[in-house]
UniProtKB/Swiss-Prot annotation:
Function as written in the Swiss-Prot or TrEMBL entry: Involved in targeting and insertion of nascent membrane proteins into the cytoplasmic membrane. Binds directly to 7S RNA and mediates binding of the 54 kDa subunit of the SRP.
Family indicated by similarity: Belongs to the SRP19 family.
Family annotation (Gene3D superfamilies): Signal recognition particle, SRP19-like subunit (3.30.56.30)
Species the sequence originates in: Natronomonas pharaonis (strain ATCC 35678 / DSM 2160 / CIP 103997 / JCM 8858 / NBRC 14720 / NCIMB 2260 / Gabara) (Halobacterium pharaonis)
Cellular localisation: Cytoplasm
Subunit structure of this chain's protein: Part of the signal recognition particle protein translocation system, which is composed of SRP and FtsY. Archaeal SRP consists of a 7S RNA molecule of 300 nucleotides and two protein subunits: SRP54 and SRP19.
Gene designation per UniProt: srp19
Pfam families: SRP19
Transmembrane segments: none
GO biological process, one term: SRP-dependent cotranslational protein targeting to membrane, signal sequence recognition
Main location: cytoplasm
GO cellular component: signal recognition particle
Tree of life domain: Archaea
Gene Ontology MF term list: 7S RNA binding
Protein name (record): Signal recognition particle 19 kDa protein
Length: 92
């Protein structure tokens, strides 16, 4: 079973590509939380586990991470784009 890790920095509009953002700027959102990301992952159809004590290596403050389980059929970039779209929809 494949496990993908999604750090909030991957979807953060305040981060540059060098700082860790992995989606296009128009898909990125301002300061996404692990709760929003986990909710979006579940809406996409995968299981999500929140690990709040983890810190992205390029950041100082711990924001946590989301571990996605069972995403064998999707590439990581496709998964990130779908999650970013759902996080945007959740905020509206």
């Amino acid at each position: 079973m494949v496990e993908n890790v999604i750090w909030p920095a991957y979807l953060d509009a305040n981060c540059t590509r060098n700082e860790g953002r992995r989606v296009a700027e128009d898909l990125a959102v301002e300061e996404p939380t692990v709760d929003e990301i986990a909710s979006a992952v579940q809406q996409v159809g995968y299981d999500a586990v929140i690990e709040r004590s983890k810190t992205y290596p390029r950041e100082y403050e711990p924001r946590g991470r989301v571990v996605v389980k069972g995403a064998d059929d999707a590439s990581k970039s496709d998964l990130l784009e779908a999650v970013a779209a759902y996080v945007t929809a959740i905020r509206e």
